[in-house]
Amino acid sequence: GYFSEVNPVFTSVPEGVKLDFAVTVNPVTTGVSFEGNTVYSSEVLTKFMDIQPGQVLNSVSVGQKVQGINAAYARDGYMLAHVDGIRVDDQGVLHIHIVEGIVEDIIPAGNKKTRNKVITREFVQKKGKPFNKFLVRRSVERVYNLGFFDDVNVRMLPGEQDPNNVIIEIDVLEHKTGTITLGAGYSKSDGLMGIVEFGEDNF
């Protein structure tokens, strides 16, 4: 993992053909820099990489440690987050770019009587923050527990501003939340009276 390029070189000699290899050694690293990370600090991610300044870059080791970063994001629920690019600049600094799968928007669908804000205010997953499956699951439970819906589902759509982002669509199936009260009364002036009251509680 210490070489970026290995090329065979064949040379004719009296005994036949001599085989040599021309190698390009990976650069010596002077540090590591992270871009796009908000969930974990650069200090925490630097500990994941464990790169010592002055060492020749080992691409195999870097690949393994990058997978460790991806696994940490996934373990904590950030299922769309991953290392998106790695490069070494002329000064030997290793730059690691991370995309975290930002939620661009949260859009209710299927609600005809229930106002959008009644649904979205129950979401603990917020717009502008990295998508987290645990927060989305809790949000769906909160929406369902409102008692207005027979079914609540989430669809993930590609982001419009950035394909690495996501738009959350909350698809709900409303049940009848209206209440009807029937009653009857009697007065000397009006005789028998009917009482009908109708109310909606999902506003």
List each model region and its residues.
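Periplasmic polypeptide-binding modules associated with outer-membrane biogenesis and secretion
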Residues: 1-192, 197-200
